[in-house]
């Protein structure tokens, strides 16, 4: 990937982008083999690769500069504001909207928040784009309600210029610390969610719900998990850490009932709405802690799918899974290091199949899907 920001050493987030993408994939595959299955008889499937540019559906921009010259991007290594509105990770429609927003913020006279002086209002711009519809969800993260009047007054101009903006909200984050968002979300549009679609499965995205940032690869991840589950054909399964229900919605079938568990109520609301849109009646969701849910169960279904955050399952949940003894565990991980640690604690299981998905090109990160079978 040709990136001027990287060449100038002003942004090094994509620290591998100087390497040809094919070489990145080869190196990552070798590293993951050595980490996950160095001496095991495991079916290692070819990786699912990504486009090397224009693959992200979400931008998180710090609002820098001053009201008369706002900048959306980051601070570089020297502490200087760097506009990233033309970052090659973003599709052209996102780049165009981000560039327009820089000028729109200036015209609206909204002062960026200055973390050193603890003055100003606008902290972040969070932009999400539906790959399926091309529509946007735009969130302004502000220090206080003082910014609302200027945003509302100038919003018609913004939406007239970009009618694909479907959802607009203001998130209030009053704390002076490195926190992306606060508790209060104020919607400025009637529509409060964005609709995505993977493999003919509708996915509802709300402001605070986690959603994969590489939709083309995520679609293949969900399709692969569905295919593996259908090979097993369980009558019941759990989807722990289910988020907005991507795996559960794909895996539910007339003969497979799925229970999705996620601690974030907003994500569960999204998952439930998707299930209603699909007309699925053997799919249920609950806003619960996955470990506490497992602890409350006397037995497990034939298959448990887990998709934990970067910290992994943790000893409490791995111990519960050992005791509940499902025949299969399907583990999707964004952190292979913690996944390997968790699998070591699942002593009654052995890896049967592994495939990784390059959700994060130009970095060391990968999404890994592993099928574990009880010995």
UniProtKB/Swiss-Prot annotation:
Name the enzyme group at the top EC level.
transferase
Q: Which GO terms describe its molecular function?
A: 4 iron, 4 sulfur cluster binding; iron ion binding; rRNA (uridine-C5-)-methyltransferase activity
- Which annotated residues bind S-adenosyl-L-methionine? 212, 241, 262, 307
- Provide this UniProt record's keywords sorted from A to Z: 4Fe-4S, Iron, Iron-sulfur, Metal-binding, Methyltransferase, rRNA processing, S-adenosyl-L-methionine, Transferase
EC numbers:
2.1.1.189
What InterPro entries does this protein map onto?
23SrRNA_MeTrfase_RlmC, MeTrfase_TrmA_AS, SAM-dependent_MTases_sf, U5_MeTrfase_fam
Pfam annotation, one family: tRNA_U5-meth_tr
List the Gene3D superfamilies hit by this protein, alphabetically. Answer: 2.40.50.1070, Vaccinia Virus protein VP39 (3.40.50.150)
Q: Specify which residues bind [4Fe-4S] cluster according to the UniProt entry for this protein.
A: 3, 11, 14, 87
Give the GO terms filed under biological process for this record: rRNA base methylation
Reactions it catalyzes: uridine(747) in 23S rRNA + S-adenosyl-L-methionine = 5-methyluridine(747) in 23S rRNA + S-adenosyl-L-homocysteine + H(+)
Catalytic site positions: 334 (nucleophile)
Q: What does this protein do?
A: Catalyzes the formation of 5-methyl-uridine at position 747 (m5U747) in 23S rRNA.
| Family (UniProt) | Belongs to the class I-like SAM-binding methyltransferase superfamily. RNA M5U methyltransferase family. RlmC subfamily.
- Which PANTHER family has this protein been placed in? RNA M5U METHYLTRANSFERASE, TRNA (URACIL(54)-C(5))-METHYLTRANSFERASE
Query: Which protein, by its recorded name, is this?
Result: 23S rRNA (uracil(747)-C(5))-methyltransferase RlmC
What gene is this protein translated from? rlmC
């Amino acid at each position: 990937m040709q990136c001027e920001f990287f060449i100038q050493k002003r942004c090094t987030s994509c620290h591998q982008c100087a390497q040809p993408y094919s070489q990145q994939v080869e190196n990552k595959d070798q590293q993951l083999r050595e980490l996950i299955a160095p001496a095991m008889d495991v079916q290692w499937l070819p990786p699912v690769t990504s486009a090397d540019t224009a693959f992200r559906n979400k931008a998180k921009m710090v609002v820098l500069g001053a009201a008369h010259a706002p900048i959306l991007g980051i601070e570089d290594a020297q502490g200087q504001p760097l506009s990233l509105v033309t970052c090659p990770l973003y599709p052209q429609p996102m780049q165009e909207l981000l560039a327009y927003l820089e000028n729109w913020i200036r015209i609206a006279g909204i002062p960026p928040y200055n973390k050193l002086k603890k003055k100003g209002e606008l902290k972040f711009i969070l932009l999400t784009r539906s790959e399926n519809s091309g529509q946007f969800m735009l969130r302004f993260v502000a220090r206080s309600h003082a910014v609302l009047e200027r945003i509302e007054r100038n919003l018609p101009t913004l939406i007239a210029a970009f009618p694909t903006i479907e959802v607009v909200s203001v998130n209030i984050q009053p704390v002076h610390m490195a926190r992306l968002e606060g508790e209060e979300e104020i919607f400025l549009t009637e529509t409060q969610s964005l609709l995505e679609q993977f493999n003919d499965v509708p996915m509802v995205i709300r402001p605070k719900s986690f959603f994969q940032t590489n939709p083309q690869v995520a679609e293949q991840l969900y399709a692969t998990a569905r295919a593996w589950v259908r090979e097993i054909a369980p009558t019941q399964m759990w989807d722990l850490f289910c988020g907005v229900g991507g795996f559960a919605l794909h895996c539910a079938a007339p003969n497979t009932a799925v229970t999705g568990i996620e601690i974030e109520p907003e994500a569960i609301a999204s998952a439930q709405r998707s299930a209603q849109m699909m007309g699925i009646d053997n799919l249920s969701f609950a806003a619960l802690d996955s470990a506490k849910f497992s602890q409350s169960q006397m037995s497990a279904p034939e298959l448990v799918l887990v998709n934990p955050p970067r910290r992994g399952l943790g000893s409490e949940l791995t111990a519960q899974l050992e005791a509940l003894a499902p025949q299969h565990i399907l583990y999707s991980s964004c952190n292979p290091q913690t996944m390997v640690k968790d699998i070591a604690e699942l002593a009654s299981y052995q890896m049967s199949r592994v495939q990784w998905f390059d959700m994060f090109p130009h970095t060391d990160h990968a999404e890994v899907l592993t099928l574990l079978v009880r010995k």
